[in-house]
């Protein structure tokens, strides 16, 4: 008799749990969907989102980087390589500015360390490649990225929304 009572309680618990699960599923079916169909729909990005790197220019077209190498020194992943030379007017400019995006951890230290806001992490997060070599960004690629995003970066500065 005791065995039948225990068996009955187990059956009741099992049926109760199953009905509860079905009820939760039924409730979820009528809630609004929160899933985005990614390639066609994109969610909002934070104003402080850190994406693909870029080098900025002054409005005159001259690159901002003064080759102080603070970004290279502060990078915990050692992803940045800079070579510089002195110009005839005494100022220093970069001859080589490389970022290995396979090493980068997107911490934002490089743009925080930059005294002239030359290096930034822009809003682009869709930069997949077919080879690892394409993730080695040189100075020309970084300057091209900066030219593409300059309007978005200016807007953030105007709205007093820093990019880190």
From Swiss-Prot:
| InterPro entries noted in UniProt | 4Fe4S_Fe-S-bd, 4Fe4S_Fe_S_CS, NADH_quinone_OxRdtase_chainI
Q: Which reaction does it catalyse?
A: a quinone + NADH + 5 H(+)(in) = a quinol + NAD(+) + 4 H(+)(out)
Q: Which PROSITE patterns match?
A: 4FE4S_FER_1 (PS00198), 4FE4S_FER_2 (PS51379)
Enzyme Commission designation: 7.1.1.-
Chief location category: membrane
Biological process GO annotation list? aerobic respiration
Q: Which GO terms describe its molecular function?
A: 4 iron, 4 sulfur cluster binding; iron ion binding; NADH:ubiquinone reductase (non-electrogenic) activity; quinone binding
Pfam annotation, one family: Fer4_7
Q: What topology in the membrane does the UniProt record assign?
A: Peripheral membrane protein
**Location in or out of the cell:** Cell inner membrane
Give binding positions for [4Fe-4S] cluster 2: 75, 104, 107, 110
- Which controlled-vocabulary keywords does the entry list? 4Fe-4S, Cell inner membrane, Cell membrane, Iron, Iron-sulfur, Membrane, Metal-binding, NAD, Quinone, Repeat, Translocase, Ubiquinone
Residues given in the record as [4Fe-4S] cluster 1 binding sites: 65, 68, 71, 114
A cellular component term, taken from the record's GO annotations: plasma membrane
Q: Where is the 4Fe-4S ferredoxin-type domain?
A: 56-85, 95-124
Is Membrane there in the keyword field?
A: yes
What highest taxon heads this organism's lineage? Bacteria
Q: Which NCBIfam families match?
A: NuoI, PRK05888.1-4, PRK05888.1-5
Say what the protein does: NDH-1 shuttles electrons from NADH, via FMN and iron-sulfur (Fe-S) centers, to quinones in the respiratory chain. The immediate electron acceptor for the enzyme in this species is believed to be ubiquinone. Couples the redox reaction to proton translocation (for every two electrons transferred, four hydrogen ions are translocated across the cytoplasmic membrane), and thus conserves the redox energy in a proton gradient.
By sequence similarity, the record places it as follows: Belongs to the complex I 23 kDa subunit family.
State the name under which the record lists this protein: NADH-quinone oxidoreductase subunit I
Q: Which gene name belongs to this protein?
A: nuoI
